Amino acid sequence: MNKTIIIPCFNEKQTILTVIQNVKNNLIDGDEIIIVDDFSSDGTRDLLNNLNDPIIKIKYHDRNYGKGKAINTALKESLKEVVIIQDADLEYNPDE
């Protein structure tokens, strides 16, 4: 069963690339990652803009709406049967 991993983020410049790599290490063929940047101002957007990966969709909010809205934005884009939400701050490591 394929899954979507949703990563809502806000000002996660220090952790976002690590989280993305950790999530990618645990994917199977057909899975997707959707990242929603909730109007970061610390350079997170610049890092995301430089990603070029066909399994990653990136959505950007035009202002800070909060985590709930970021999740809802991603859910509208999800094409898979199973959805997992992974916070960008590494509080929960996807390798564990």
Cite the ranges covered by each PLM segment.
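A conserved acidic beta->alpha catalytic loop
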Residues: D37-D46, L90
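Donor nucleotide-sugar binding loop of glycosyltransferases
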Residues: E12-T15, S40, K67, N93
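Cell-envelope/extracellular polymer assembly enzymes that use nucleotide-activated donors
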Residues: N2-T4, E32
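Catalytic metal- and UDP-sugar-binding loop of GT-A-like glycosyltransferases, i.e.
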Residues: H61, Q86-A88
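Conserved sequence signature across two-component system core domains
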Residues: C9, V36-D38, H61
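Conserved donor nucleotide-binding strand/loop of the catalytic core
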Residues: D31-I34, R45-E77
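Short, well-formed alpha-helical segments that are part of the catalytic scaffolds
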Residues: E12-N25
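Short aromatic/hydrophobic "clamp" motif used to bind/position activated sugar donors
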Residues: V83
